Amino acid sequence: MSTLLASMKAVPKAVSNLARYAIPAIVLTGTAFLMLDNFSYTLFGIASHSASTFAFQAYYWIIIFLFFIYFIDKLAKANSTDGVIGKYCGSLLKLMLILLGLSSVSLVVSYNQPLSTELGVSTAAVSATPLRDKLPNIIFLGADGVNSSNMSIYGYQRVTTPFMDSIAHESLIYRNHWTNSSKTTGSIGALLTGKYPTRTKVIFRPDTFKGEDMFQHLPGILRGLGYYNIDITLRHYIDSEDLKMRNAFDYANHRQLNQQGSQLKHFFLLRWPTMVQFIEENGLRLYQRLAHLSGYTSMVNPRKQIHQGADAAPHLSDIGRIKQLKEQILQAPKPFFANVHLLGPHGSKFDYQEAIFTETKQQDEHWMVDHYDNAIYQWDAYSREIYQLLDELGELDNTLLVFSSDHGKGHSVNETLPLIIRYPNKEHTGTITQASQRVDIAPTVLSYLGVTPPQWMDGHSLLSRGNDFYPIFIVTSSMQQLTNAGDWKVAANLKPPFYSLGTISMAYCGILYSMDINDIHQPLLSQQRVHPKAATCPDVDLEPMLAYGMIVTHLKEMGYNTDQLNVELRLRQYSVRTE
C-alpha cells in the first residue's frame, strides 16, 4: 500500500519535471540520437534508415524514448536542492555568463554584413511591356545525359525524336550547345542562375549555394514578376531547397514550400548564413529519420534513386515527374514557370516504357546504345504529351518551351547537347550554329520577357547576341568516389584551394582545352577539335600556353587562389603536355 501511495505521489512530480524540462530534453535527445545513428553506422553499418520492419522501427523508438526519460531525470536531479545546480548555483551562474559571453563574441566574430537580396533587375513594369499582351508560361523540360548526336532532329540516322522533328519548323534549334558542368548539380545550377559553376562553387554535392548566390537566380526574378514556380527534379542532387536556393520555388518535388519563413530566421540568415544552414541541415536529417521510423515517409538513398531506373517507385520515376507536371499545368496559377528534369537517359542502364530499337527492355550490359536511344525516344514522347496538353488547354501559344540536357552521355563534356526553344506563336524559328552554353538560357528567357538580364549573370542573351565568339568554361567534379549505393557509402577527397572542382575545360572556336587542376605534379593540358570552326573565329588556333593562361585567368576572376597554377612556375617545375 505504501509503495502504491509513493508511486501516486511521484506522478505529479514526474508531470512537473516533464513540463519544466521537456524542451531541453528534446534538444539533447535529438542530438544524442543523431550522434548514435552516425556512430553505429560508421562502425557497424547499422542505422535508422535501414529500419524497414515494424520491430526494427519500434527498437529505435524505444531508444529515443529512453534517451528522453534519461535526460528528463538527469535535468531534474541536477536542478534539485542537492543536485549539481542546487549545490553550485552561484558558480554555474558565473559559468553560464562566461559561456554566454563567449557565444556573443562568436556571434560578433562570425557576423557578416547583411546579404543583399536585390536581384539587380527592375520588374515593376515588365508585365505591361509592349512586347506582348501577357507574360507566358515557361517550361524547361530537360533530360539527363543526352547527346544531340543521338537525336534525329540533329541528323541522327534513327528516328529517336519524331515529335521534336515535327515541330522543328516552329522552333529555334541550337546546333552547338554546351554544358557548363559534367555533373547535373552544377549544370542545373548554371541553368537556373545564369552563373558559371566556378562562380557559385556549386559543382557537385555536398556543394550548396551560399551568400548572395542563394538569392540571385532566374526563379527569384520570375517570382518578382508574379510567376508561380514549380520544381520537378530530384531530391538531394538538384532539388532547389536542398541546394539552398532561397525565394525560388513555390512547389518542389511533391511539397509546397513556404518561401516567406519567419522574420527572425530571415534576419539571422542574412547575417549568419553558415550558422542557419548548419541548423537547417541537422534539423532536416533528424526529421528524415523520425519520419522514416514513424512510417510517414521512407528515406530514399539519392544515389540509388538515380541508378535504379525501372525499379524506381512510381512517384520517384519519370512517369511520376510527368504526372506531377500535368497536374501543375492544370492546377497552378498562371503564369507559371516549371523546371523539370527527367532521368531516363542517365545510365548506365536506361529507363523507358516501350522498347523501340530493341526486342526487349533487357539490358545485359552497361551503356547499351540501342537502349539509350529508347530512353531518348521516351523523352520525346513525354514532350509530345506536354505539348498536346498545352494545345488542348489553349495554352500552347502562351507557353515558352525549352528542351535541353544537362551534360553528355556518361557525364561527358566533349559532346554537344540539345537546345530547342519553341517560342509562343512561333516568334523565333530557324537554326543557330553559333556556340552557346547553359548559362545563356536564363538571360535569353529574361530578354524575351522584356527584362534586361542582371550584371551578375555570366551568360548572354541568345536573342540579341551577334556573331561574336567567346570562351565557354566547363567543369567536372574532383570527387574520387567510392560508392555503394545500397549502403549509403560515399567517400570524397576534397582539398583546397579547389575543393569540388576537378577538371576545367574551355571550349573556344571549336576546340576543347582541358586540364586537371588538382594534378599538381604534372598538370595535363589537352586539346580536341569538337566542332567546325566558325567563320568569325581567327584562322590560327590558340597556342596551348595562351589557352592555359585564359583558363587560369577565369579561375582567378571567379575567386580561386591560382598560385599553384602560375604558368611560369609550371613551366619551370612541371611539363605541360599538349595532346
State what each model feature region is.
Residues 130-136, 147-264:
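His/Cys-centered metal/cofactor-coordination and adjacent catalytic loops
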Residues 142, 178, 231-233, 336-344, ...:
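Short beta-strand segments
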Residues 148, 163, 374-426, 442-452, ...:
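Metal-dependent active-site segment of extracytoplasmic phospho-/sulfohydrolases and closely related
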Residues 242-330:
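Formylglycine-dependent
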Residues 134-138, 170-175, 223-230, 332-338, ...:
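Loop/turn elements at helix/coil->beta-strand transitions in domains of secreted/extracellular proteins
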Residues 89-95, 103-134, 316-336, 356-399, ...:
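A long, amphipathic alpha-helix that forms part
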Residues 292-308, 323-374, 378, 410-418, ...:
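Active-site His/acidic residue clusters
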Residues 1-26, 30-45, 49, 57, ...:
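Membrane-interface soluble catalytic domains
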